A protein has these predicted regions:
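Conserved catalytic core of the tyrosine transesterase superfamily
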Residues: 1-212
Length: 212
């Protein structure tokens, strides 16, 4: 008997202001802070899953003057080619150069304090650390529960809101089905509904006599 699909709960994503705030929290003057800031920015620019970030090696990346081309090793051993913009590319390159592994193609880009290859659990701890910090410092923001996958949701949502075609977002994220990507259009619609409600509450005619 085929199992019934359980509807997924609402997916939390970050607003643009929350993304900017999150990027500012790591102290990039030390090794851990520099790693964490680079990781957060890379995940937003690439929309990658946590495991895909763990698997990323120096040899997967080709740097160009205005961008980087990256081979992402996704689910089912499928590899997809994506590009990230100049700012994210420069940050990633500087981090790799800082680690002195730019010519070591087999090295993993992100490592933990104890292992050469970072784990998903380590990425989860990084997000938990900075989201907890953000909730304390900015109580009016970060009102929901977040995971590393929230950044992937955020990338998809912001791409769609910027007018990027659904099929392009699908390929960028490595979704097998377009139906999976359409989940994010619902988030975008929800964002639009909130904006419309705000407009109605603040600006629409309040005098009901106009309609009598």
């Amino acid at each position: 008997v085929p199992k019934k699909k359980v509807p997924r709960k609402g997916r939390s994503s970050f607003t643009r202001d929350e993304v900017k705030t999150l990027f500012q929290l790591p102290d990039s003057s030390n090794e851990i802070g520099l790693r964490d800031k680079t990781l957060l920015c890379f995940m937003y620019a690439s929309g990658t899953r946590a495991q895909e970030v763990c698997d990323l090696t120096v040899g997967d990346i080709q740097f160009y003057p205005d961008r980087a081309g990256i081979n992402i090793h996704g689910k089912g051993q499928k590899v997809r080619r994506i590009g990230i913009p100049c700012d994210a590319s420069n940050m990633l390159k500087k981090y790799i150069e800082h680690r002195r592994i730019i010519n070591d193609t087999g090295r993993h880009v992100f490592s933990s304090q104890t292992h050469e290859k970072m784990s998903v659990a380590c990425i989860e701890e990084i997000y938990s650390k900075y989201i907890d910090k953000a909730k304390l410092e900015y109580p009016e923001m970060f009102r929901y529960s977040y995971t590393p996958h929230s950044m992937r949701h955020t990338t998809a949502t912001h791409m769609l809101e910027a007018g990027v075609p659904l099929i392009v977002v699908k390929n960028f994220l490595g979704h097998v089905s377009l139906q999976t990507t359409q989940i994010y259009t619902e988030i975008t619609q929800d964002t639009m509904n909130k904006q419309l409600k705000s407009w109605n509450d603040k600006w629409f005619l309040k005098d009901n006599s106009h309609f009598e």
